[in-house]
């Protein structure tokens, strides 16, 4: 789909998120393309991207720059293949490289501890780790040509693209803002219909990841946005309204958690199961529901509204009376 000089390309993803949208920006003289995110490392995704580029009168050789919104598999997976075969400059936040430098076994150990101590059944944790380990080991984060920081402008391109660091869903998450057209590419930071999850690795690294996410959402209210293009679901025409909806959603969820804890002590996994119920039936959705619940509980604990109690290696949460 094309809007002005922007193309949204839907690429298949071989797990529960189903798809990702990557974005192509045509240069004013139609000589080159900027790619925002690139899709998962699958033949289906690569062929779909290549065919789309050819259908609009370009070739993969016209790709000049790829900006990665964040280091989650469906957003960066094709980087290595593109980098090896085409002269594309790769840009990303330095935190993406920081994650790549962490010992992989340490990450697995931290994830295991996080979910076990928050009440998730061991069989579910093991199943997820097997899936996660396969994806990450087979698709390492490649070398980045240029790191970009909050407030930077992408160099050597005709578009005036400003980089906005927007942590929360991921520590390295970026939004990209075109000052001239007032278009923003929001990655997984602002999505229509669903609320972005607080990323798993960021849950481990941050004491209050939900608060960080809320603060970076608030920052986007300072930008005049005509339309935003997320990595999933539809473009958002009323981005400020959507941001406020997401902020209200998280406040409502915190109140729901507190009400759930009125008369009993529960684990994060138990609370997440009550919130999401049967719609979170797959292992991927179980992980998402648990991580989001942990993020809320960390925020509530920081605000002095809940306590955690460690019993037999598992954290139980109770409401502060």
Regions found by a protein language model. Give the residues of each.
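Conserved beta-strand hairpin/beta-sheet module of binuclear metal-dependent hydrolase folds
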Residues: 1-56, 176-189
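Short Pro/Gly-enriched beta-strand edge/turn motifs at strand-loop
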Residues: 3-10, 131-137, 157-159
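A short catalytic or substrate-binding loop motif that flags glycine-/basic-rich loops and adjacent residues
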Residues: 15-18, 146-148, 167-170
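Short, well-ordered beta-strand micro-motif
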Residues: 24-26, 155, 162, 175-177, ...
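Divalent metal-coordination and catalytic microenvironments
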Residues: 25, 37, 70, 90-93, ...
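Metallo-beta-lactamase
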Residues: 40-42, 134-140, 160-251
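Active-site HxH/HxHxD metal-binding segment of metal-dependent hydrolases
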Residues: 44-45, 54-154
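C-terminal regulatory/interaction regions
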Residues: 256-321
């Amino acid at each position: 789909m094309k809007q002005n000089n922007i193309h949204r390309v839907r690429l298949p993803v071989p797990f529960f998120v189903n798809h990702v949208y990557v974005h192509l920006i045509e240069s004013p003289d139609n000589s080159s393309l900027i790619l925002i995110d690139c899709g998962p490392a699958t033949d289906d995704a690569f062929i779909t991207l290549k065919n789309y580029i050819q259908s609009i009168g370009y070739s993969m050789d016209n790709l000049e720059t790829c900006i990665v919104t964040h280091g989650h598999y469906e957003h960066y997976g094709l980087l290595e293949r593109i980098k090896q075969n085409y002269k594309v400059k790769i840009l990303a936040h330095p935190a993406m490289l920081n994650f790549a430098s962490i010992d992989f076994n340490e990450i697995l150990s931290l994830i295991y501890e996080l979910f076990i101590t928050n009440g998730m059944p061991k069989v579910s944790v093991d199943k997820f780790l097997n899936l996660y380990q396969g994806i990450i080991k087979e698709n390492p984060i490649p070398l980045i040509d240029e790191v970009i920081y909050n407030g930077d402008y992408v160099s050597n391109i005709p578009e005036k693209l400003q980089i906005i660091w927007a942590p929360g869903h991921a520590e390295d998450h970026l939004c990209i803002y075109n000052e001239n057209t007032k278009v923003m590419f929001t990655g997984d930071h602002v999505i229509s219909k669903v609320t972005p999850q607080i990323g798993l690795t960021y849950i481990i690294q941050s004491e209050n990841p939900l608060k960080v996410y809320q603060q970076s959402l608030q920052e986007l209210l300072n930008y005049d946005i005509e339309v935003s293009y997320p990595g999933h679901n539809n473009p958002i025409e009323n981005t400020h309204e959507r941001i406020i909806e997401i902020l209200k959603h998280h406040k409502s969820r915190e109140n729901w958690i507190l009400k759930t804890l009125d008369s009993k002590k529960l684990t994060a996994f138990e609370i997440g199961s009550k919130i999401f119920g049967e719609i979170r039936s797959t292992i991927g959705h179980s992980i998402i529901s648990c991580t989001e619940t942990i993020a809320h509980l960390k925020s509530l604990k920081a605000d002095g509204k809940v306590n955690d109690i460690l019993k037999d290696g598992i954290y139980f949460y109770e409401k502060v009376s």
